[in-house]
Amino acid sequence: MPPERHPPDTPAEWLNRAASDLAIARAKIEGAYLEDLCYHAQQCVEKAFKAVLLHRQRGFPYIHDLAELANRIELSGLPLPADIRDVVGLTEYAVEGRYPGFDEPVLEEQWADAVEKCSRALEWCRDVLGAR
């Protein structure tokens, strides 16, 4: 069952969308490429970071670069713990993994790592927003 919808310009709705991407990333759907699931892991973090920026009343560009979004969060006065900053490496799944021939196929261990990282980032963002 989908979560309660909120207005699209609220941190709550961005967190809902991040949680939806996490659910998709975790689902090992038969016939799905692992790189497609990793794309959703990246999207989870992107949307969760954007929820934090909205919460801190900061605008953001519609970009996929997690390092840039992390920098914007820190510029808002909120330091990112090292284990959260570590998730910026998921940016590579925003484009390369979605199209044939851009990169090597994702391995099971890489997928599991991406899911763990995005899950950790989403939990941190929820904590920042007090949205448990």
Task: Locate each region found by the language model.
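Terminal alpha-helical segments
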Residues: 1-132
